[in-house]
A protein has these predicted regions:
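General small-molecule cofactor/ligand-binding pocket signal
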Residues: 128-130, 191, 241-244
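A short SAM/SAH-binding and catalytic strip from SAM-dependent methyltransferases
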Residues: 152-168
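Plant-skewed but cross-kingdom recognition/interaction modules and surfaces
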Residues: 114, 169, 178-189, 233-234, ...
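Conserved beta-strand signature within the Rossmann-like core of class I S-adenosyl-L-methionine
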Residues: 154-158, 174-200
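Rossmann-like AdoMet
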Residues: 1-130, 137-151, 278-281, 288-296
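A short, conserved alpha-helix within the catalytic core of class I
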Residues: 122, 127, 135-143, 164-184
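Rossmann-like AdoMet/SAM-dependent catalytic core
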Residues: 201-296
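Short, conserved secondary-structure transition motifs
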Residues: 133-136, 195-204
Length: 296
């Protein structure tokens, strides 16, 4: 299945990013299947940008909550965020970390985790890996109810997942989870990374290339801009929302960090960087009115 292959490709790209020194992740190489994938400097920096932003969001949410949090990772694939958090701080305040994905990916991930003591030793009652179909909204809610506790601060993350599903489905999924699982009035955050802008020349090529690969951005036309993503979050009841292109997100990275990244690899064509990263957005939304966590 094409979606399973995209998960493995994403994993291999993170591995290359780690080997170049961008990220500290001692676990992701355990999941690598394709050792031939090599990123361009542009792709390495983009991978660093979104990976770091997601991790900083979760860390910031935990700090602001002041109590153990719950994490829901939609379409987690071979992501290692839970293991990175617990590796860096065994007492990281997470009550439950629930990863949801297709059955084949979940089975494979479970097998690899059990095979490596470095990962298996970090798995306890806090970590839950569940197979499910995100189209089955009620089924997802049922699974989450079995593992999560209403009233506990919860952060939902979706990295390049919802764009593969019709917008009406993902909106209903978020609404149902917020209403039936997390409980109204509970501190909730939603963080997403998705492709956007399908209608210009670059966007059309991006969409067509994916179709040739056997997959489809079924939700990209429903939320084609950062503003559309922000509007959805507002309509779902989030009070504080930040939705920006990845190009603009990078502009918030402190200069000293950018200098460090340049020492790892130089980007020669910033026009290409700007074009590509204008076609991806990062969304952070909170039900609270306090400022959002600082991403960088």
């Amino acid at each position: 299945m094409a979606l399973i292959q995209t998960a493995h490709d994403a994993c291999s790209r993170v591995v290359h990013c780690v080997r170049k020194g961008y990220l500290d992740d001692p676990f992701v190489s355990f999941f690598e299947k394709d050792h031939t994938i090599v990123n361009s400097p542009l792709m390495n920096r983009g991978t660093w940008l979104r990976t770091t932003a997601f991790e900083n969001c979760v860390r910031g949410f935990a700090t602001a909550s002041g109590q153990p949090i719950q994490v829901i990772s939609f379409g987690a694939g071979m992501d290692t965020l839970y293991f990175r958090l617990k590796h860096s701080d065994p007492k990281f305040p997470v009550q439950k970390f629930v990863e949801l994905d297709l059955a084949d990916l979940v089975t494979e991930k479970e097998r690899i985790i059990k095979r490596h003591k470095e990962m298996h030793s970090l798995v306890g009652s806090q970590y839950v890996l569940v197979s499910c179909n995100l189209y089955d909204v009620n089924g997802v809610a049922k699974v989450l109810k079995e593992h999560l506790q209403g009233g506990t601060p919860t952060i939902m993350i979706a990295e390049m997942v919802f764009v593969y599903i019709e917008g009406s489905v993902t909106t209903n999924l978020l609404r149902t989870v917020m209403k039936d699982v997390i409980d109204a009035g509970t501190s909730t955050m939603f963080v997403a990374y998705d492709a956007i802008q399908p209608f210009d020349r670059f966007g059309k090529v991006m969409v067509e290339s994916l179709q040739h690969f056997g997959a489809e951005f079924k939700g990209i036309s429903d939320f084609p801009t950062p503003e559309a993503h922000a509007q959805r979050c507002t309509e779902l009841g989030f009070k504080t929302v930040q939705s920006v292109t990845m190009k603009n997100l990078y502009l918030s990275v402190p200069r000293q960090i950018q200098i460090h990244l340049n020492k790892l690899e130089m980007i020669d064509d910033w026009e290409e960087w700007n074009l590509m990263h204008d076609h991806y957005c990062f969304v952070v939304a909170s039900t609270g009115e306090d400022p959002l966590p600082k991403l960088f």
